[in-house]
């Protein structure tokens, strides 16, 4: 099972202003949102918040509109767009879930509720920081 760093997610009440800061001040490149196909959110599943993306070439930043109700709306116990998170990509999400379970770490499996091409799970580190691990499913 391979694991590699993928992105940092920051949440904001003003995604456009945050994105402008990273692009204009830190000179990061914009990543077009069509590179990240999303699922359609409903009143019971998914996430319809505003998202923008930036990169310095190797690492991505996902800048998302803060939403305190995502976990409840999706029937999960971890909310990845309340405070933000760091993310890793794996080539075997099922093996990684088994690894977490074997170590007594609970996780929230969002499947493809947020991103049409990623199976995402979220869990907490010992300090309460949210970590995402996803596998590309296309």
Which residue stretches match the model-derived regions?
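A short, acidic/glycine-rich surface segment
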Residues: 37-42, 69-74, 109
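Vicinal oxygen chelate
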Residues: 1, 5-13, 49-57, 73-138
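Short glycine-aromatic motifs
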Residues: 2-3, 28
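Hydrophobic side chains in well-ordered alpha-helices
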Residues: 18-21, 96-100
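A short acidic-to-branched-hydrophobic micro-motif
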Residues: 61-65
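Core segments of cupin and vicinal oxygen chelate
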Residues: 11-59
């Amino acid at each position: 099972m391979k694991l590699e760093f993928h992105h940092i997610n920051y949440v904001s009440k003003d995604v456009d202003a945050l994105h402008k800061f990273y692009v204009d001040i830190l000179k990061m490149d914009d990543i077009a949102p069509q590179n990240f196909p999303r699922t359609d959110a409903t009143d019971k599943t998914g996430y319809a918040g505003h998202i923008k993306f930036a990169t310095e070439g190797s690492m991505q930043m996902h800048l998302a509109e803060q939403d305190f109700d995502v976990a409840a709306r999706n029937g999960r116990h971890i909310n990845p767009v309340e405070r933000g998170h760091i993310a890793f990509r794996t080539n075997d999400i099922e093996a990684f879930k088994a690894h977490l379970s074997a170590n007594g770490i609970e996780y929230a499996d969002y499947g493809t509720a947020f991103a049409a091409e990623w199976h995402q799970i979220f869990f907490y580190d010992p300090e309460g920081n949210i970590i995402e691990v996803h596998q590309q499913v296309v």
